[in-house]
Amino acid sequence: MGCVSMTLGIDEAGRGCLAGSLFVAGVVCNEKIALEFLKMGLKDSKKLSPKKRFFLEDKIKTHGEVGFFVVKKSANEIDHLGLGACLKLAIEEIVENGCSLANEIKIDGNTAFGLNKRYPNIQTIIKGDETIAQIAMASVLAKASKDREMLELHALFKEYGWDKNCGYGTKQHIEAINKLGATPFHRHSFTLKNRILNPKLLEVEQRLV
């Protein structure tokens, strides 16, 4: 087993949302296992139906030869630390936990946040979720986690359409924020920066009990 090349792929979901958490996931496996998932219909998670994403998420998490990590950064953390800092911290946590399992580390996007100085085997790949199976697998875990969170929050705040828009700034979502104000799960740094709401919190704490 020592000579089998293992790749750690990393991707995120929820980066550009107005509401909910950022999820960053990492998946470690060899090329043979990656091929198994490609045969199951694995591709960039944005091109998969929610049903297929949840199916693949279960297969990834229950496969005996796949290592995985999922890190969540809440809207509150994003407001206090900034999106870039949260993304870096989450990627750093995954790399620190997964680096001993992998020969190569591949991150979707164009920045390694300076971590390649400490981990020279890091490679950044733009649209990596379309070309690297392990990044696509990480993309599935991150997006399924984000979908699940927003479906749960939708049960508390149906007016914002989170079951459909997943927290992104759609016309309906922005109109709901303008009309009703923000919830405790909105990223106030995002919504205020975009000047789409009054700085008032919705009186909804009783719904959280």
Swiss-Prot record:
A divalent metal cation binds at D11, E12, D108. It catalyses: Endonucleolytic cleavage to 5'-phosphomonoester. GO terms for molecular function: manganese ion binding; RNA binding; RNA-DNA hybrid ribonuclease activity. InterPro entries: RNase_HII, RNase_HII/HIII, RNase_HII/HIII_dom, RNaseH-like_sf, RNaseH_sf. It is an enzyme of class 3 (hydrolase). One of its GO terms (biological process) is mismatch repair. PANTHER family: RIBONUCLEASE H2 SUBUNIT A, RIBONUCLEASE HII. This is Ribonuclease HII. It comes from Helicobacter pylori (strain J99 / ATCC 700824).
